[in-house]
């Protein structure tokens, strides 16, 4: 490393930043506003800000605008707040470089509320965005704008229109691959590509930049341009391309490294990839240190490190000496280096990707060049563009077929869950040891080859003395296996109940000491796509690939729409998570929502059963007792005839009451069977018409959990209900304030965890 000072400097920088994070010193710079101003903004949501338009995009419901050099106007004073993302109520005629004055509701960007949730706060903090402005109304705008940046936007829009005409239904995929634009990309398509482990081809990366940049450079050389003009033109073109396609961290990493490589070529210097990678990383981290913990940064740089540092060593360990065997083994090195990152941020790793990338990567250049050729020809003739893009569209059909194969298989991904920091460090310790073993084998093979050439020994005699190398290979394999097992290790032994923050709704995850898993409800009236953005990430982060049962208390949408979405994903092969049973309330009259859920379960291969009063569902040391509805329940009043369950483990009891009201509580009291409980999932999101005083006097919950959104039209939770709970001696926990609430017990002692600590 002494011969590569940039690498040493980068290593020390990363080590220092990592140490700061481990010591509790955050890499995020923090809120740029004074505390008193923050408090006043929270109390008076109407705010006025002024900033320069950097970019904008039109969505289905609003116009999203990114502002830079922004300041807040508060009590005739100006407070700089760096960058802000605003959502305008109506579409405005804006251009990059304009300075605009807008009024709206200014809110801090929040972090995730649930395990596995996307960390918006960190993502935007890397980009110096700490506030969103909702319901924004444009007050003023300047006439001056950046003609250069507007031109780039217009070029991008023209390219998008050409692809729409030339590629038809495949246009969103080509827009993602060639323009870095995923705005119109179907979410299910993204899920299929992710499941198959080929989602990376939809992002602008080093592969794209090298194909386009070097292709342009070589074309210009063949046209008669010298090294300097061809190189400088290629440099400029790739820089503009990187800016036009959005300037993501992976794009700018690839563009910067291309600039360094081309600079070395035109000046006659030797290009060192590790030094270029180090310089690029330092440039990004100096501008925003928080990128060190950004998934895009870690995966982009991790892939290059895997190919540059680990590939040859892993090939040596695997005995891969020929080109085709190295081509098979090298991607494994990349996967090994990025494995902890994938698990930390996504909870799963595509196993199918090991195989499918061998088929996809050699051909993705055809797709990219086909898209680019269509863009160029489309300026003159759309029919010609349709013709030239046809082979690329055929390849996309092949990719979709591969994705469907992966989706049908339950083994295509490993859901290992989110590892702890110590697990990641131990894994990398094992991996580094394995790489040293690979380096040793590589050197020994080189020495033996040299000896055999000098002494004219036969290859058989050289290999005969390789027993030591075989032993090292076996040891390395064991080390890797142990490291991976440690990475996916999740200690059991206790009961864990996670009340997810689903906004206005319910979603509860139960993990038993014997590693059985259940979902109780899963729906929301305030959050869309709950299955994709909440339930799936939460399950993956906990390492759950199998749900023993999904309980449905009743069929209101705020309890079932996420579950239905999850079942549909299972049926379509968009997730490898599977379930055993869907347990529905035993109603005589089954509403449409009940039947639709049952049908979705059938398509997903999930068995359907019903449960009513008196049913016991044992699962090892844990049991579910159904207290309601009665076996002759009609199901006409879905709230009052919701499924009520008691979860028991040792001396611990927890009561789940769905959306029942005072009438059903009276019936439960009259029927007997209720007893003291340690934890109560408060009925109907804290409604004033539920959780009566008499009911609380009987069950005496030590902890009560209320699940609802911070702002809702129902007035949940009702102040009267909260007062009754406190009067009963209950510790009241709210998902709306602290995100997911976790109840963990060994059957005797109780521990409460809040996902959001602030």
Task: Describe these PLM feature segments.
Residues 1-12, 465-474:
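N-terminal Sec-pathway targeting helices
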Residues 13-16, 20-200, 457, 532-537, ...:
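Membrane-interface helix/helix-cap signal primarily in integral membrane proteins
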Residues 17-18, 186-354, 370, 416-492, ...:
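Hydrophobic alpha-helical transmembrane segments in multi-pass membrane proteins
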Residues 54-57, 296, 502:
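Feature for secretory/organellar precursors and membrane-associated catalytic proteins
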Residues 75, 90-100, 105, 123-124, ...:
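Non-globular, low-confidence helical/coil segments that flank catalytic cores
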Residues 126-257, 262, 336, 498-500, ...:
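Aromatic-rich juxtamembrane segments at the membrane interface
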Residues 148-166, 170-173, 178-181, 189, ...:
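Hydrophobic alpha-helical segments of integral membrane proteins
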């Amino acid at each position: 490393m002494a011969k590569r000072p940039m690498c040493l400097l980068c290593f020390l920088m990363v080590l220092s930043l990592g140490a700061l994070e481990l010591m509790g010193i955050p890499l995020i710079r923090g809120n740029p506003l004074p505390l008193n101003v923050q408090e006043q903004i929270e109390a008076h949501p109407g705010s006025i800000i002024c900033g320069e338009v950097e970019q904008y995009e039109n969505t289905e419901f609003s116009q999203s605008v990114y502002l830079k050099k922004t300041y807040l106007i508060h009590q005739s004073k100006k407070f700089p707040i760096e960058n802000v993302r605003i959502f305008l109520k109506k579409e405005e005629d804006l251009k990059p470089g304009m300075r605009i004055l807008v009024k709206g509701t200014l809110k801090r960007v929040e972090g995730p509320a649930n395990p596995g949730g996307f960390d918006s706060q960190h993502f935007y903090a890397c980009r110096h965005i700490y506030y969103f402005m909702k319901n924004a109304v444009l007050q003023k705008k300047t006439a001056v704008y950046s003609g250069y940046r507007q031109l780039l936007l217009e070029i991008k829009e023209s390219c998008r229109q050409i692809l729409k005409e030339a590629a038809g239904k495949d246009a969103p995929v080509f827009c993602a691959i060639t323009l870095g634009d995923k705005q119109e990309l179907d979410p299910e398509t993204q899920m299929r590509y992710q499941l198959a482990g080929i989602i990376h081809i939809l992002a602008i990366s080093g592969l794209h930049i090298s194909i386009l940049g070097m292709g342009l450079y070589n074309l210009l050389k063949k046209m008669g341009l010298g090294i300097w003009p061809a190189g400088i033109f290629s440099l400029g073109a790739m820089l503009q391309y990187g800016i036009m396609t959005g300037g993501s961290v992976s794009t700018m990493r690839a563009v910067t490294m291309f600039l360094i490589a081309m600079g070395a070529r035109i000046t006659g210097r030797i290009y060192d990839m590790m030094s270029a990678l180090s310089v690029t990383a330092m440039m990004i981290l100096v501008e925003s240190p928080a990128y060190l913990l950004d998934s895009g940064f870690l995966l982009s740089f991790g892939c290059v490190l895997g190919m540059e540092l680990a590939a040859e060593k892993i090939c040596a360990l695997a005995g891969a000496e020929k080109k085709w065997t190295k081509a098979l083994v090298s991607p494994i090195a990349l996967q090994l280096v990025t494995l902890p990152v994938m698990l930390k941020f996504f909870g799963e790793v595509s196993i199918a990707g090991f195989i499918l990338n061998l088929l996809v990567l050699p051909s993705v250049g055809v797709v990219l060049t086909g898209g680019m050729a269509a863009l160029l020809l489309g300026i003159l003739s759309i029919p010609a563009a349709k013709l030239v893009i046809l082979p690329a569209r055929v390849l996309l059909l092949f990719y979709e077929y591969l994705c469907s194969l992966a989706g049908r298989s339950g083994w295509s991904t490993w859901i290992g869950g989110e590892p702890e920091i110590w697990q990641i460090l131990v894994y990398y310790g094992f991996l580094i040891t394995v790489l040293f073993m690979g380096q040793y084998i590589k050197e020994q093979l080189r020495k033996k080859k040299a000896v055999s050439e000098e002494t004219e020994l036969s290859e058989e005699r050289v290999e005969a003395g390789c027993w030591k190398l075989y032993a090292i290979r076996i040891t390395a394999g064991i080390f890797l296996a142990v490291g991976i097992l440690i990475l996916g290790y999740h200690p059991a032994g206790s009961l864990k109940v996670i009340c997810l923050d689903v906004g206005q709704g319910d979603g509860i995850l139960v993990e038993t000491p014997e590693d059985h898993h259940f979902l109780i409800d899963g729906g929301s009236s305030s959050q869309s796509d709950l299955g994709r953005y909440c339930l799936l990430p939460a399950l993956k982060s906990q390492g759950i690939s199998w749900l023993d049962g999904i309980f449905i208390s009743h069929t209101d949408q705020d309890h079932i729409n996420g579950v239905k979405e999850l079942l549909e994903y299972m049926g379509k092969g968009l997730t490898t998570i599977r379930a055993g049973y869907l347990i529905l309330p035993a109603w005589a009259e089954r509403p449409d929502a009940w039947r639709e859920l049952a049908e979705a379960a059938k398509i997903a291969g999930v068995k359907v059963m019903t449960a009513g009063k008196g049913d016991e569902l044992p699962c090892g040391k844990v049991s579910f007792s159904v207290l309601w509805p009665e076996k002759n329940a009609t199901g006409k009043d879905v709230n009052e005839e919701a499924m009520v369950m008691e979860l028991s483990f040792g001396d611990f009891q927890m009561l789940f009451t769905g959306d029942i009201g005072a009438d059903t509580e009276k019936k439960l009291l009259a029927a007997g069977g209720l007893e003291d409980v340690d934890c109560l999932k408060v009925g109907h999101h804290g409604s004033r018409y539920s959780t009566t005083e008499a009911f609380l006097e009987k069950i005496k919950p030590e902890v009560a959990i209320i699940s609802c959104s911070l702002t809702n039209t129902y007035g949940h939770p009702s102040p009267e209900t909260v007062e009754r709970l406190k009067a009963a001696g209950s510790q009241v926990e709210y998902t709306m304030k602290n995100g997911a609430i976790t109840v963990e017990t060994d059957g005797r002692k109780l521990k409460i965890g809040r996902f959001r600590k602030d």
